[in-house]
Amino acid sequence: MKMTTTLMATSAIVMAGTSAFADAHMASEMTIVSWGGAYSASQQAAYHDPYSEMTGVTIINDESSAEAVAKLRAMSEAGNVTWDVVDVVASDAIRLCDEGLALEIDADTQLADGDDGSTASEDFGDLLVSDCFIPQIVYSTTAGYRTDLVGDTPPTSICAMFDLETYPGMRSLEKRPINNMEWALLCDGVAKADVYDVLETEEGQAQAFAKLDTIKDNVVWWSAGADTPQLLADGEVVMGTTYNGRLFALIEEQKQPVGMLWDAQVFDLDGWIIPTGLSPEREARALDYVKFATDTQRLADQAKYISYGPARASSAPLVGQHATLGIDMAQHMPTDPENAKNTFLYNYEWWADYRDDLDAKFQAWLSQ
C-alpha cells in the first residue's frame, strides 16, 4: 500500500463562513483514499493542502481506490474501518450505498451551497446519482496513440483499436469489463442506444467477448492509470486506453509524441463517499472535509492541475488556465463541445447491478 503523509500545519485557522474547522470533537488525522498519479496530485494541491493549512489536520494518502469495494467489505466484516474518505467512481458508490457501507448524505444540509446562490442539490443536479455519493469531477476513459507509429492516417474512431491490419502492434486496455465490453459491441455493429440491452443477455456478452478475442493476443492489460501513459511513452504499444487526464499530462506536460482520440470517450463520474462504521469524531471530520473539498471554488481549483471537469455547475465559469503551463483548460475538458461530439454515456446503475457477475466472467475469459 503506497502512502504519503501531508505536512501538518502548526496552527489551525478558522475561516469565516466555514464550519468549525478546529472543533475539538473532530479527529486530528484522516486517511483519504484515491487513485494516485496526476489525479491525486491535483487533489493534494486543490483540497488536501489548503484543508490541512486551515485545520492542522494530518492527511494520509492511500492509493487504493481501484480496490475500494472489496477492501471496504473486508473492513466492515472485520469491524475495523481504517479509511475516512474514499474517492470512487459512481457505480461503486451505488454498490457501497446499497450494501450499507457508505454514509448517506443530505446534500442541502451537509454540503456547501453554490457560489451562485444555488443549493448543493441544484448545483450538482443529475450528478447526484446516489444518496451516498458526493460528486467531484466528470472525466472520461478514452484512447491515446503514438503519432509516430500510426503512419499517415491517424485513427479517428475507437474501432481502430480492433483494426490490426491498418494499425498493427500492441494495444493496452484496462483489465476489467467496463468500457471494453461496450466498445466491443459498438465496433461490432450494435447501435449506441442498444448496447446495454444487448449486454444484458448471454448472447450479447458472448458477442462482446468474441470481438475482444480478435485482439486479445495483441493486448497489454493494465490495472493502474499510469500504465498506458508509460507504455505509450516507451513505444511498447501503438495505442491504448486510459483516463483523459493521464493523456493530457503525457501530451501537454511531458510533450510525448501522442495524440488523443476523443471518439466514443466514456463519460464517468468520480467523487467521495464516507464509509459507515467511523467513530463520531472521525465521521465529523470526514463530513467537514468533503464540505470544504466540494465547494464551488475548490472544484474549480482542481481544474488548474488536471483536465477533468468540475461536477458543480457553478464551478465551470471559474475554470481558467493551468497552474504551471498557462494554457486554457476548458478546451482540454472531456465536456468541451468539440471533444464531446461522439460520447458514450456510462450506465452507473446497470454496472452496479451487473459488475460482480461480469467481473467474474471477464477474469475467466482472460485466463482462457
Where do the model's predicted regions map?
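A bilobed periplasmic-binding-protein/Venus flytrap-type ligand-binding module shared by bacterial periplasmic
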Residues: 142-149, 185-186, 269-282, 301-304
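Periplasmic-binding protein-like
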Residues: 205-214, 253-276
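Conserved C-terminal helix/tail region of periplasmic/extracytoplasmic solute-binding proteins
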Residues: 335-368
